[in-house]
């Protein structure tokens, strides 16, 4: 069976997923596209999915009989509306992060999904599919380094554009770490603090960069995450987990060490698309496979909600300068199956 997929949002990540489904993966076919800029959708169709229908609205796309599953890759503020439309139509939906830009909308999504009686939503937390993170989790789960005490992490981008704002360091960047650390440690957060080191001169005038997020879990594990989105030298993701018996580090992507002119060097990637390309492939293939036969099995709406609650607390901490509590509802049994 080939799964007919409709894609809402044909910007950078949307086009990358359209290419991925059309050229790199199996079992899926792009049958419909929608974007607020119809020319973007037409260009994406011409390049990657020439048979796809361009829909006037996202709702029209979701309603099409040949659209059996939906991918939401539009601007984050639109995600909740489009995910709710897909749930109402009873169609599996892959939603790039964030699931919604606030916890209240995540709750609406969970309520709608539970009312449907089966899982329909997968959230695009692709690091859970990265081989390095999978190996790191296996080491933690088998107790090799003993009980975890703390985590030191880092998320650096070469540079960001003029539309990037200070709070986006949380809602657009840190949100990946907020999810993957919950998953690695199998635990929830209880508090967050954000501090601002000396500001880099490379940041645009309207933003503060870098930032450091300090998190605590229910088990007392302390996590510090440096977010530096104008680091200049490349795209660099690090994670060091310290346990009672040792330390486990997320491996860097493989690169050939080069010795020349009395210098040892190694290439550093400059784009998230290449750093996590294999994880993206695995993530979308998993969605296609599961949606074709039943329900998605990747990161669920609860994961999206948990990340959103933590992100909300971090944004409050940016503004207040205080340690802010992270308070969630009790996990519904629906998401504990």
Curated annotation (Swiss-Prot):
Catalytic reactions on record: myo-inositol + NAD(+) = scyllo-inosose + NADH + H(+)
Keyword NAD: yes
Swiss-Prot/TrEMBL GO biological process terms: inositol catabolic process
EC number(s) given by UniProt: 1.1.1.18
UniProt cross-references to SUPFAM superfamilies, sorted A to Z: Glyceraldehyde-3-phosphate dehydrogenase-like, C-terminal domain, NAD(P)-binding Rossmann-fold domains
InterPro entries membership: Gfo-Idh-MocA_inositol_DH, Gfo/Idh/MocA-like_OxRdtase_C, Gfo/Idh/MocA-like_OxRdtase_N, MI/DCI_dehydrogenase, NAD(P)-bd_dom_sf
Protein role: Involved in the oxidation of myo-inositol (MI) to 2-keto-myo-inositol (2KMI or 2-inosose).
Quaternary organization: Homotetramer.
Name this polypeptide is given: Inositol 2-dehydrogenase
């Amino acid at each position: 069976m080939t799964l007919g997929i409709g894609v809402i949002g044909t910007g950078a990540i949307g086009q990358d997923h359209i290419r991925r489904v059309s050229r790199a993966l199996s079992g899926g076919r792009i049958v419909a596209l929608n974007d607020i800029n119809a020319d973007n959708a037409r260009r994406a169709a011409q390049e990657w999915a020439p048979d796809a229908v361009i829909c006037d609205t996202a709702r029209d796309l979701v309603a099409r009989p040949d659209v059996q599953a939906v991918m939401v890759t539009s601007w984050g503020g639109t995600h909740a509306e489009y995910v709710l439309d897909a749930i109402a139509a009873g169609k599996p939906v892959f939603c790039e992060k964030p699931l919604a830009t606030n916890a209240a909308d995540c709750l609406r999504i969970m309520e709608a999904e539970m009312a449907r009686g089966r899982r329909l939503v997968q959230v695009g937390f692709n690091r859970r599919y990265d081989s390095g993170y999978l190996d790191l989790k296996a080491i933690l789960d088998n107790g090799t380094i003993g009980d975890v005490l703390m985590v030191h992490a880092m998320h650096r981008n070469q540079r960001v554009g003029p539309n990037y704002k200070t709070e986006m360091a949380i809602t657009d960047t840190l949100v990946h770490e907020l999810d993957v650390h919950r998953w690695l440690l199998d635990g929830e957060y209880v508090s967050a603090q954000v501090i601002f080191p000396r500001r880099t001169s490379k940041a645009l005038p309207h933003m503060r960069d870098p930032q450091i997020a300090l998190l605590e879990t229910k088990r007392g594990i302390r996590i510090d995450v440096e977010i530096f989105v104008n680091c200049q030298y490349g795209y660099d993701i690090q994670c060091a987990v310290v346990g009672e018996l040792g330390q486990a580090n997320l491996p860097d992507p493989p690169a050939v060490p080069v010795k020349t002119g009395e210098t040892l060097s190694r290439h550093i990637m400059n784009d998230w698309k290449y750093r996590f390309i294999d994880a993206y492939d695995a993530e979308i293939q998993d969605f296609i496979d599961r949606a074709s036969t039943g329900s998605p099995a990747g990161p669920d709406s609860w994961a999206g909600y948990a990340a959103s609650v933590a992100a909300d607390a971090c944004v409050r901490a940016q503004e207040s300068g205080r340690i802010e509590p992270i308070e969630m509802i009790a996990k519904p049994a629906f998401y504990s199956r």
